[in-house]
């Protein structure tokens, strides 16, 4: 995993002295990213979004991320969102509301903390799901590209790795992670796949 990240930075000509905002949900992919970037001694700042959608579970995710960052000496911030109210006001889905809220905050914090990039934990399985969803929606050629590894200031260094490889890294390094119960809910398009 460390080699994957080093290769990604080299391939995309990203200076290792740059500053990286790491988006951390507490799931296996984001914990892998956070641990690997810390291990590589890169300049990082962790951000965790509490969307207040899963009651105690959301708060437990937040506490887990705080403890992880404290253990590894990683500076971090948390922001609470009223995602349901935002979705209602905008007339959009909860998924879209959470996406808009988090990326707006990530960019705001990137500038405030004088960092260069926002790093998110999308992996190969996410890429395959996105392509499938786009095909089902009758996408054009543009939609067949799926998730790009670099878009503006957003980096996705794990796109070449499967969830299985990410879990192996977690186990090898004896790292914990949280599982979002909504991943099992058929209320979200991605989960129906």
Feature map (PLM): residue ranges:
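Core alpha/beta nucleotide-donor-binding catalytic domains of modification enzymes
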Residues: 1-193
């Amino acid at each position: 995993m460390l080699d994957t990240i080093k290769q990604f930075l080299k391939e995309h000509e990203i200076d290792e002295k740059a500053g990286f905002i790491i988006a951390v949900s507490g799931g296996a992919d984001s914990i892998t990213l956070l641990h690997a970037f810390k291990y590589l001694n890169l300049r990082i700042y962790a951000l965790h979004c509490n969307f207040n959608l899963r009651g105690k579970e959301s708060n437990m995710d937040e506490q887990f991320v705080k403890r992880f960052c404290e253990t590894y000496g990683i500076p971090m911030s948390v922001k609470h969102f009223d995602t349901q109210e935002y979705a209602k006001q905008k007339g959009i889905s909860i998924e879209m509301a959470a996406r808009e809220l988090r990326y707006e905050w990530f960019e705001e914090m990137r500038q405030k903390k004088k960092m260069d990039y926002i790093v998110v934990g999308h992996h190969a399985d996410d890429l395959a799901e996105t392509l499938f969803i786009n095909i089902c929606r009758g996408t054009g050629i543009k939609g067949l590209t799926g998730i790009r590894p670099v878009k503006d200031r957003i980096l996705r260094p794990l796109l070449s790795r499967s969830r299985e490889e990410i879990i192996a890294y977690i186990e090898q390094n004896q790292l914990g992670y949280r599982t979002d119960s909504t991943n099992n809910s058929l209320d979200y398009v991605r989960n129906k796949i």
